[in-house]
Amino acid sequence: MEPLDRELDEAELDLPSEPMLLNMGPSHPAMHGTVRIVLELSGETINKADVQIGYLHRGFEKMCERGTWSQVFPYVDRLNYVSPMLNNVGFALAVEKMLGVTVPERCQYYRVILGELARICDHMICSGAMSMELGAFTPFLYLCRAREIFWEIFEEETGARLTHSFGRVGGMARPPTADFKAMVRVGLARVLALVNDAEKLILKNRIFLDRLDGVGQISQEDALALGWTGVVLRATGVPYDVRRANPYMVYDRFEFDVPVGTRGDNYDRFMCRQEEIRQAGRIIEQALEQMPDEGPINIDDPRIVLPPKEEVYTTIEATIQHFKIVMEGIKVPAGECYSYTEAGNGELGFYLVSDGSGTPYRVRIRPPCFATTQGLSQLITGLMIPDVVPTFGSLNMIGGECDH
Protein backbone atom coordinates (compact mmCIF):
# COMPACT_ATOMS: atom_id res chain seq x y z
CA MET A 1 0.00 0.00 0.00
CA GLU A 2 1.37 3.39 -0.95
CA PRO A 3 1.79 5.86 1.91
CA LEU A 4 -0.63 8.79 1.95
CA ASP A 5 0.79 12.24 1.39
CA ARG A 6 -2.23 13.99 2.90
CA GLU A 7 -4.36 13.82 6.04
CA LEU A 8 -7.65 11.98 5.88
CA ASP A 9 -10.79 13.74 7.09
CA GLU A 10 -13.30 12.08 9.42
CA ALA A 11 -15.64 11.16 6.56
CA GLU A 12 -12.92 9.17 4.82
CA LEU A 13 -11.84 7.48 8.04
CA ASP A 14 -15.46 6.54 8.81
CA LEU A 15 -14.98 7.17 12.53
CA PRO A 16 -18.01 7.31 14.86
CA SER A 17 -18.96 10.93 15.45
CA GLU A 18 -21.77 10.65 17.97
CA PRO A 19 -21.01 11.56 21.61
CA MET A 20 -20.19 8.80 24.07
CA LEU A 21 -21.65 8.48 27.58
CA LEU A 22 -19.24 7.58 30.37
CA ASN A 23 -20.21 6.74 33.95
CA MET A 24 -17.91 7.82 36.77
CA GLY A 25 -19.10 6.38 40.06
CA PRO A 26 -20.98 5.86 42.24
CA SER A 27 -18.29 3.37 43.35
CA HIS A 28 -15.28 4.99 41.70
CA PRO A 29 -12.12 5.33 43.85
CA ALA A 30 -11.96 9.09 43.18
CA MET A 31 -15.59 9.79 44.10
CA HIS A 32 -15.43 11.29 47.59
CA GLY A 33 -18.46 9.66 49.06
CA THR A 34 -20.78 7.94 46.64
CA VAL A 35 -21.50 10.21 43.67
CA ARG A 36 -22.35 9.34 40.09
CA ILE A 37 -21.23 11.61 37.27
CA VAL A 38 -22.59 10.85 33.80
CA LEU A 39 -20.29 12.43 31.23
CA GLU A 40 -21.14 13.11 27.59
CA LEU A 41 -17.86 13.04 25.69
CA SER A 42 -16.44 14.05 22.35
CA GLY A 43 -13.20 12.14 22.39
CA GLU A 44 -11.86 13.02 25.86
CA THR A 45 -13.52 16.43 26.03
CA ILE A 46 -16.56 16.76 28.28
CA ASN A 47 -19.60 18.23 26.52
CA LYS A 48 -22.07 17.77 29.38
CA ALA A 49 -21.96 16.42 32.92
CA ASP A 50 -24.87 15.16 35.01
CA VAL A 51 -23.89 15.00 38.69
CA GLN A 52 -26.17 12.67 40.66
CA ILE A 53 -26.05 12.77 44.46
CA GLY A 54 -28.12 11.13 47.18
CA TYR A 55 -26.47 7.72 47.40
CA LEU A 56 -25.57 8.34 51.05
CA HIS A 57 -28.94 9.74 52.12
CA ARG A 58 -29.83 8.36 55.56
CA GLY A 59 -32.83 10.41 56.64
CA PHE A 60 -30.75 12.57 58.97
CA GLU A 61 -33.40 15.20 59.61
CA LYS A 62 -36.14 12.71 60.49
CA MET A 63 -33.80 10.76 62.76
CA CYS A 64 -33.10 13.97 64.67
CA GLU A 65 -36.83 14.46 65.22
CA ARG A 66 -37.28 11.07 66.89
CA GLY A 67 -35.08 11.56 69.97
CA THR A 68 -34.29 14.24 72.51
CA TRP A 69 -32.21 17.32 71.72
CA SER A 70 -29.13 15.73 73.31
CA GLN A 71 -29.49 12.57 71.24
CA VAL A 72 -28.87 14.53 68.02
CA PHE A 73 -25.13 14.93 68.66
CA PRO A 74 -24.12 11.45 67.39
CA TYR A 75 -26.06 12.15 64.19
CA VAL A 76 -24.40 15.50 63.45
CA ASP A 77 -21.02 13.82 63.95
CA ARG A 78 -21.75 11.86 60.80
CA LEU A 79 -22.44 14.83 58.53
CA ASN A 80 -18.94 16.02 57.66
CA TYR A 81 -17.21 13.09 59.32
CA VAL A 82 -13.77 14.53 58.52
CA SER A 83 -14.28 17.42 60.99
CA PRO A 84 -17.11 16.24 63.29
CA MET A 85 -16.27 18.59 66.16
CA LEU A 86 -17.34 21.59 64.06
CA ASN A 87 -20.74 19.94 63.56
CA ASN A 88 -21.07 19.31 67.30
CA VAL A 89 -20.35 22.94 68.13
CA GLY A 90 -22.67 24.23 65.40
CA PHE A 91 -25.66 22.24 66.64
CA ALA A 92 -24.98 23.07 70.29
CA LEU A 93 -24.91 26.80 69.47
CA ALA A 94 -28.24 26.50 67.63
CA VAL A 95 -30.02 24.89 70.60
CA GLU A 96 -28.41 27.34 73.03
CA LYS A 97 -29.68 30.20 70.88
CA MET A 98 -33.23 28.88 71.30
CA LEU A 99 -32.71 28.49 75.04
CA GLY A 100 -31.23 31.98 75.31
CA VAL A 101 -28.14 30.79 77.19
CA THR A 102 -24.42 31.45 76.76
CA VAL A 103 -21.83 28.92 77.85
CA PRO A 104 -18.96 29.96 80.15
CA GLU A 105 -15.95 31.67 78.63
CA ARG A 106 -13.67 28.71 79.29
CA CYS A 107 -16.02 26.45 77.34
CA GLN A 108 -16.09 28.87 74.41
CA TYR A 109 -12.30 28.80 74.14
CA TYR A 110 -12.31 25.01 74.49
CA ARG A 111 -14.81 24.74 71.64
CA VAL A 112 -12.78 27.11 69.47
CA ILE A 113 -9.55 25.17 69.95
CA LEU A 114 -11.12 21.77 69.27
CA GLY A 115 -13.03 23.18 66.30
CA GLU A 116 -9.92 24.71 64.72
CA LEU A 117 -8.01 21.46 65.21
CA ALA A 118 -10.82 19.74 63.31
CA ARG A 119 -10.70 22.40 60.58
CA ILE A 120 -6.99 21.79 60.07
CA CYS A 121 -7.61 18.03 59.82
CA ASP A 122 -10.32 18.67 57.22
CA HIS A 123 -8.14 20.90 55.04
CA MET A 124 -5.10 18.63 55.31
CA ILE A 125 -6.97 15.56 54.13
CA CYS A 126 -8.59 17.45 51.25
CA SER A 127 -5.22 18.78 50.09
CA GLY A 128 -3.56 15.41 50.60
CA ALA A 129 -6.25 13.57 48.66
CA MET A 130 -5.94 16.06 45.78
CA SER A 131 -2.19 15.46 45.72
CA MET A 132 -2.61 11.69 45.73
CA GLU A 133 -5.13 11.82 42.89
CA LEU A 134 -2.54 13.67 40.81
CA GLY A 135 0.11 11.04 41.50
CA ALA A 136 1.87 12.67 44.47
CA PHE A 137 1.42 9.99 47.11
CA THR A 138 4.13 11.08 49.56
CA PRO A 139 2.48 14.42 50.54
CA PHE A 140 -0.71 12.50 51.33
CA LEU A 141 1.24 10.30 53.76
CA TYR A 142 2.83 13.38 55.34
CA LEU A 143 -0.58 14.96 55.92
CA CYS A 144 -2.11 11.73 57.21
CA ARG A 145 0.72 11.58 59.73
CA ALA A 146 -0.03 15.16 60.71
CA ARG A 147 -3.71 14.35 61.17
CA GLU A 148 -2.75 11.42 63.39
CA ILE A 149 -1.13 13.87 65.82
CA PHE A 150 -4.40 15.76 66.23
CA TRP A 151 -6.43 12.55 66.37
CA GLU A 152 -4.37 11.49 69.38
CA ILE A 153 -5.32 14.77 71.07
CA PHE A 154 -9.00 14.21 70.25
CA GLU A 155 -8.77 10.67 71.59
CA GLU A 156 -7.24 11.94 74.82
CA GLU A 157 -9.90 14.62 75.26
CA THR A 158 -13.05 12.90 74.00
CA GLY A 159 -12.30 9.18 74.02
CA ALA A 160 -12.87 8.89 70.26
CA ARG A 161 -10.63 9.55 67.29
CA LEU A 162 -13.26 10.54 64.75
CA THR A 163 -16.95 10.66 65.74
CA HIS A 164 -16.61 12.32 69.12
CA SER A 165 -20.20 13.09 70.23
CA PHE A 166 -18.47 15.42 72.68
CA GLY A 167 -20.66 18.50 72.43
CA ARG A 168 -23.47 19.14 74.88
CA VAL A 169 -26.24 21.69 75.10
CA GLY A 170 -24.89 24.17 77.62
CA GLY A 171 -21.27 23.06 77.47
CA MET A 172 -19.14 20.03 76.74
CA ALA A 173 -19.10 16.45 77.99
CA ARG A 174 -15.98 16.96 80.12
CA PRO A 175 -13.52 19.74 80.97
CA PRO A 176 -10.07 19.81 79.34
CA THR A 177 -7.49 17.35 80.60
CA ALA A 178 -4.65 18.66 82.77
CA ASP A 179 -2.07 18.70 79.96
CA PHE A 180 -4.44 19.81 77.20
CA LYS A 181 -2.69 23.08 76.43
CA ALA A 182 0.75 21.49 76.36
CA MET A 183 -0.45 18.71 74.03
CA VAL A 184 -1.98 21.19 71.61
CA ARG A 185 1.09 23.47 71.55
CA VAL A 186 3.47 20.60 70.83
CA GLY A 187 1.11 18.93 68.36
CA LEU A 188 0.40 22.16 66.46
CA ALA A 189 4.10 22.87 65.94
CA ARG A 190 4.67 19.34 64.60
CA VAL A 191 1.66 19.54 62.30
CA LEU A 192 2.62 22.89 60.78
CA ALA A 193 6.12 21.56 60.13
CA LEU A 194 4.69 18.54 58.30
CA VAL A 195 2.37 20.80 56.28
CA ASN A 196 5.38 22.87 55.19
CA ASP A 197 7.29 19.71 54.24
CA ALA A 198 4.36 18.42 52.18
CA GLU A 199 4.09 21.75 50.34
CA LYS A 200 7.78 21.70 49.43
CA LEU A 201 7.26 18.39 47.65
CA ILE A 202 4.55 19.64 45.30
CA LEU A 203 4.37 23.42 44.95
CA LYS A 204 7.29 23.53 42.49
CA ASN A 205 6.28 20.38 40.66
CA ARG A 206 5.40 21.35 37.09
CA ILE A 207 2.96 18.45 36.59
CA PHE A 208 1.11 19.31 39.80
CA LEU A 209 0.86 22.99 38.89
CA ASP A 210 -0.25 22.36 35.30
CA ARG A 211 -3.07 20.09 36.49
CA LEU A 212 -4.42 22.77 38.86
CA ASP A 213 -3.55 26.17 37.42
CA GLY A 214 -6.43 27.59 35.36
CA VAL A 215 -8.47 24.37 35.61
CA GLY A 216 -11.99 24.30 37.06
CA GLN A 217 -12.49 28.05 37.13
CA ILE A 218 -15.65 29.79 38.31
CA SER A 219 -16.50 33.48 38.61
CA GLN A 220 -17.55 35.29 41.79
CA GLU A 221 -21.00 35.92 40.34
CA ASP A 222 -21.61 32.26 39.50
CA ALA A 223 -20.29 31.09 42.87
CA LEU A 224 -22.60 33.47 44.73
CA ALA A 225 -25.56 32.51 42.53
CA LEU A 226 -24.99 28.85 43.40
CA GLY A 227 -24.91 29.64 47.13
CA TRP A 228 -21.27 28.74 47.61
CA THR A 229 -19.56 29.52 50.91
CA GLY A 230 -16.30 28.59 52.55
CA VAL A 231 -12.99 28.00 50.81
CA VAL A 232 -14.54 27.51 47.36
CA LEU A 233 -16.16 30.97 47.52
CA ARG A 234 -13.13 32.69 49.00
CA ALA A 235 -10.98 31.22 46.22
CA THR A 236 -12.93 33.39 43.76
CA GLY A 237 -11.98 36.53 45.70
CA VAL A 238 -15.03 36.96 47.97
CA PRO A 239 -13.71 37.41 51.56
CA TYR A 240 -16.76 35.89 53.28
CA ASP A 241 -15.99 33.95 56.45
CA VAL A 242 -18.70 33.52 59.09
CA ARG A 243 -16.09 33.84 61.86
CA ARG A 244 -15.31 37.34 60.59
CA ALA A 245 -18.64 38.44 59.08
CA ASN A 246 -20.79 37.29 62.02
CA PRO A 247 -18.45 36.36 64.90
CA TYR A 248 -19.75 33.76 67.33
CA MET A 249 -18.31 32.51 70.62
CA VAL A 250 -15.00 34.40 71.08
CA TYR A 251 -13.84 34.71 67.46
CA ASP A 252 -14.04 38.50 67.65
CA ARG A 253 -11.09 38.44 70.07
CA PHE A 254 -8.64 36.85 67.63
CA GLU A 255 -6.40 38.34 64.98
CA PHE A 256 -6.47 36.27 61.80
CA ASP A 257 -6.60 36.80 58.05
CA VAL A 258 -9.20 35.52 55.58
CA PRO A 259 -7.25 34.02 52.65
CA VAL A 260 -8.76 34.73 49.23
CA GLY A 261 -7.89 33.75 45.67
CA THR A 262 -8.28 35.62 42.41
CA ARG A 263 -9.46 33.19 39.73
CA GLY A 264 -11.50 30.54 41.53
CA ASP A 265 -9.60 27.63 39.98
CA ASN A 266 -8.25 24.40 41.46
CA TYR A 267 -4.95 26.04 42.35
CA ASP A 268 -6.61 28.88 44.27
CA ARG A 269 -8.79 26.43 46.19
CA PHE A 270 -5.72 24.38 47.10
CA MET A 271 -3.70 27.40 48.23
CA CYS A 272 -6.59 28.92 50.20
CA ARG A 273 -6.88 25.70 52.19
CA GLN A 274 -3.16 25.65 52.86
CA GLU A 275 -3.20 29.23 54.12
CA GLU A 276 -6.31 28.59 56.22
CA ILE A 277 -4.40 25.84 58.01
CA ARG A 278 -1.88 28.46 59.13
CA GLN A 279 -4.60 30.95 60.08
CA ALA A 280 -6.34 28.27 62.15
CA GLY A 281 -2.99 27.72 63.85
CA ARG A 282 -2.86 31.43 64.69
CA ILE A 283 -6.33 31.25 66.22
CA ILE A 284 -5.40 28.20 68.29
CA GLU A 285 -2.25 29.87 69.63
CA GLN A 286 -4.20 32.97 70.69
CA ALA A 287 -6.98 30.87 72.23
CA LEU A 288 -4.45 28.88 74.27
CA GLU A 289 -3.05 32.13 75.67
CA GLN A 290 -6.46 33.60 76.49
CA MET A 291 -8.24 30.47 77.77
CA PRO A 292 -8.73 30.50 81.57
CA ASP A 293 -7.07 27.61 83.41
CA GLU A 294 -9.90 27.41 85.93
CA GLY A 295 -13.64 27.81 85.80
CA PRO A 296 -16.76 25.92 84.80
CA ILE A 297 -17.21 24.30 81.40
CA ASN A 298 -21.00 23.91 81.59
CA ILE A 299 -23.67 26.44 82.50
CA ASP A 300 -25.15 26.23 85.99
CA ASP A 301 -28.71 25.21 85.10
CA PRO A 302 -30.08 21.89 86.37
CA ARG A 303 -32.81 21.95 83.69
CA ILE A 304 -30.20 21.73 80.93
CA VAL A 305 -26.98 20.16 82.22
CA LEU A 306 -26.64 16.71 83.77
CA PRO A 307 -25.43 16.65 87.39
CA PRO A 308 -22.01 15.18 88.30
CA LYS A 309 -22.03 11.39 88.48
CA GLU A 310 -20.90 11.32 92.11
CA GLU A 311 -23.99 13.35 93.05
CA VAL A 312 -26.28 11.09 91.00
CA TYR A 313 -25.10 8.12 93.06
CA THR A 314 -25.39 9.88 96.43
CA THR A 315 -28.36 12.32 96.36
CA ILE A 316 -31.98 11.83 95.34
CA GLU A 317 -32.22 15.35 93.87
CA ALA A 318 -29.41 14.70 91.39
CA THR A 319 -30.85 11.29 90.53
CA ILE A 320 -34.22 12.86 89.67
CA GLN A 321 -32.55 15.65 87.68
CA HIS A 322 -30.51 13.10 85.71
CA PHE A 323 -33.57 10.93 85.06
CA LYS A 324 -35.74 13.79 83.80
CA ILE A 325 -33.11 15.17 81.39
CA VAL A 326 -32.26 11.74 79.98
CA MET A 327 -35.80 10.39 79.70
CA GLU A 328 -37.80 13.54 78.88
CA GLY A 329 -35.12 15.68 77.25
CA ILE A 330 -34.27 19.35 77.68
CA LYS A 331 -37.42 21.47 77.44
CA VAL A 332 -36.59 23.99 74.71
CA PRO A 333 -39.08 26.91 74.52
CA ALA A 334 -41.49 26.83 71.59
CA GLY A 335 -40.21 28.79 68.62
CA GLU A 336 -37.76 28.61 65.75
CA CYS A 337 -34.27 29.82 64.96
CA TYR A 338 -31.52 29.62 62.36
CA SER A 339 -27.94 29.41 63.55
CA TYR A 340 -24.87 29.12 61.35
CA THR A 341 -21.15 28.63 61.83
CA GLU A 342 -18.05 28.33 59.64
CA ALA A 343 -17.47 24.61 59.17
CA GLY A 344 -14.74 22.94 57.14
CA ASN A 345 -16.60 23.39 53.84
CA GLY A 346 -18.32 26.70 54.54
CA GLU A 347 -21.50 27.92 56.21
CA LEU A 348 -23.10 25.08 58.17
CA GLY A 349 -26.61 26.12 59.20
CA PHE A 350 -29.21 24.56 61.46
CA TYR A 351 -32.85 25.63 61.28
CA LEU A 352 -34.63 24.35 64.40
CA VAL A 353 -38.29 24.38 65.38
CA SER A 354 -39.42 23.51 68.91
CA ASP A 355 -42.93 22.86 70.18
CA GLY A 356 -41.83 23.24 73.78
CA SER A 357 -41.20 19.54 74.37
CA GLY A 358 -37.96 17.65 74.90
CA THR A 359 -37.91 16.51 71.26
CA PRO A 360 -37.16 18.67 68.20
CA TYR A 361 -40.28 19.33 66.14
CA ARG A 362 -38.22 20.09 63.02
CA VAL A 363 -34.51 19.98 62.23
CA ARG A 364 -33.35 21.37 58.90
CA ILE A 365 -29.70 21.47 57.92
CA ARG A 366 -27.95 23.73 55.42
CA PRO A 367 -24.94 21.61 54.38
CA PRO A 368 -22.31 23.77 52.64
CA CYS A 369 -21.12 21.15 50.15
CA PHE A 370 -24.67 20.50 48.90
CA ALA A 371 -24.56 23.90 47.18
CA THR A 372 -20.94 23.37 46.15
CA THR A 373 -21.68 20.08 44.39
CA GLN A 374 -24.38 21.75 42.28
CA GLY A 375 -21.65 23.70 40.51
CA LEU A 376 -19.50 20.71 39.63
CA SER A 377 -21.07 20.14 36.21
CA GLN A 378 -20.39 23.78 35.29
CA LEU A 379 -16.77 23.47 36.41
CA ILE A 380 -15.92 20.33 34.43
CA THR A 381 -17.81 21.06 31.19
CA GLY A 382 -15.21 21.67 28.51
CA LEU A 383 -12.41 19.96 30.45
CA MET A 384 -10.74 16.63 29.73
CA ILE A 385 -11.65 13.42 31.57
CA PRO A 386 -8.48 13.43 33.74
CA ASP A 387 -9.38 16.92 35.00
CA VAL A 388 -12.59 15.69 36.63
CA VAL A 389 -10.83 14.03 39.55
CA PRO A 390 -8.71 16.97 40.84
CA THR A 391 -11.56 19.42 40.19
CA PHE A 392 -14.01 17.30 42.14
CA GLY A 393 -11.42 16.81 44.87
CA SER A 394 -10.87 20.56 45.17
CA LEU A 395 -14.53 21.03 46.13
CA ASN A 396 -14.13 18.64 49.10
CA MET A 397 -17.56 17.08 48.72
CA ILE A 398 -18.29 14.92 51.78
CA GLY A 399 -21.06 12.40 51.15
CA GLY A 400 -22.46 12.38 54.68
CA GLU A 401 -22.85 16.15 54.69
CA CYS A 402 -24.12 16.55 51.12
CA ASP A 403 -26.70 13.75 51.23
CA HIS A 404 -27.49 13.80 55.01
Curated annotation (Swiss-Prot):
Assembly mode: NDH-1 is composed of 14 different subunits. Subunits NuoB, C, D, E, F, and G constitute the peripheral sector of the complex.
Q: Which cysteines are joined by disulfide bonds?
A: none
Question: Which SUPFAM superfamilies would you find in this protein's record?
Answer: HydB/Nqo4-like (SSF56762)
A GO-annotated cellular component: plasma membrane
What Gene Ontology molecular-function terms does this entry list?
Answer: NAD binding; NADH:ubiquinone reductase (non-electrogenic) activity; quinone binding
Which reaction is this enzyme known to catalyze? a quinone + NADH + 5 H(+)(in) = a quinol + NAD(+) + 4 H(+)(out)
Give the protein's recorded name. NADH-quinone oxidoreductase subunit D 1
Q: What is its EC number?
A: 7.1.1.-
